[in-house]
Regions:
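Short helix-initiation/N-cap motifs at beta->coil->alpha
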Residues: 35, 57-69, 166, 187-204
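Contiguous mixed-secondary-structure segments that line small-molecule binding/active-site clefts
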Residues: 83-176, 180-184, 188, 194-197, ...
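Bacterial N-terminal signal peptides that target proteins for export
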Residues: 1-10
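Bacterial N-terminal signal peptides
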Residues: 9-18
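Short, polar/charged alpha-helical segment
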Residues: 35-54, 176, 180-182
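Short helices/loops that flank or line small-molecule/ion binding pockets
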Residues: 47, 65-76, 92, 181, ...
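Extracytoplasmic "Venus flytrap"
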Residues: 26-44, 59-63, 167-170
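Sec/Tat signal peptide C-region and signal peptidase I cleavage site
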Residues: 19-23
């Protein structure tokens, strides 16, 4: 074989290897509407862009049902989701697997691959479970440290008003699950339903006592809770599943960009609860833009130049 033929063959091989990246469609990156959704969506977006992937920014697209509907219909290609939501997606809330980080991940990964051709990538070692927080002055005065204490307080006729999203109020595995486990029931005048699912809004409502609110829906990785003078109520009965955040990508898109899993693995593996709380606080308390917070973190860790 001549040198020219070898050279021509090498160029052809190089073109073939490069072709999928060049020919692939832009990746539609989405996320939920809340603070952490903005953070994780921007992290995914920026990691992909740093590797030359063209993207369409659909970060903070909407609530869980909206974003889930978008990826199953192909309107989105990748977004961050939480393992515990598998219980809700597959109507399987009673399986104890959802309360174990590894078992829950393996289960949702298997079900989504089989039924929806969606691939779950490496999750973060964090639990962004739903919680209820109360104003610290109310907690201290009434000895409230757990949801069991809250149940007792409400039975005694304690003043209570909760700011929460409609999703938290209505979903069987959210507020209704807490009410059932801890034997209390909130009336409509004890609830302030806020649009969307952004806990930065619900937490501020409690901190500022908006419309008489003294408690709020929050997440386990929310940063501003203590900073705003609120206290998280523990869940001693373990009502909530483990909600570990992970990138979820359409199988067809992962085949176009097989390196995606490798790019995102170390990034999500670094996002433990303390790290997420700090990053979320930068957005919700300090008022920094989620795009900037994501960029600064990725640069600091050396994943993006």
């Amino acid at each position: 074989m001549t040198i020219s033929k070898i050279w021509a063959g090498s160029l052809a091989l190089l073109a073939a290897v490069s072709l999928p990246l060049q020919a692939a469609s832009p990746v539609k990156v989405g996320s939920k509407i809340d603070t952490e959704g903005a953070l994780l969506g921007n992290i995914i977006l920026q990691v992909l862009e740093s590797h030359g992937v063209k993207t369409v920014n659909k970060v903070q697209l909407g609530t869980t049902p909206v974003v889930r509907g978008a990826i199953t219909s192909g309107e989105l290609d990748i977004y961050p989701e939480y393992t515990g939501n598998g219980a809700f997606f597959f109507k399987d809330e009673s399986d104890p697997a959802w309360k174990n980080a590894q078992a829950g991940f393996e289960k949702v990964k298997k079900l989504d691959a089989e039924q929806n051709k969606l691939v779950w990538l490496t999750p973060a070692p964090a639990n962004n479970t739903w919680t209820i927080v109360v104003r610290s002055d109310v907690a201290e005065k009434n000895k409230l440290t757990s949801l069991a204490d809250l149940g007792r307080y409400l039975k005694e006729g304690g003043t209570f008003k909760l700011a929460a999203s409609a999703e938290f109020i209505e979903r069987a595995d959210a507020l209704p699950a807490f009410e059932k486990a801890y034997d209390f029931k909130l009336s409509q005048d004890q609830l302030l339903s806020l649009a969307g699912g952004d806990t930065a809004v619900t937490i501020k409502a409690a901190a500022q006592q908006t419309s008489g609110v003294n408690a709020a829906m929050a997440y386990g990785t929310d940063g501003p809770v203590a900073a705003l003078g609120l206290q998280t109520l523990s869940d001693p009965k373990g009502v909530q599943p483990i909600y570990a955040p992970a990138p979820v990508v359409r199988e067809a898109v992962l085949k176009e960009y097989p390196q995606m899993a490798e790019w995102l693995q170390p990034v999500f593996a670094s996002l433990d609860e303390k790290t997420l709380q700090q990053l979320n606080a930068s957005i919700a308390v300090e008022g920094l833009d989620a795009k900037k917070v994501a960029a600064d973190y990725l640069k600091q860790k050396g994943w993006v130049k």
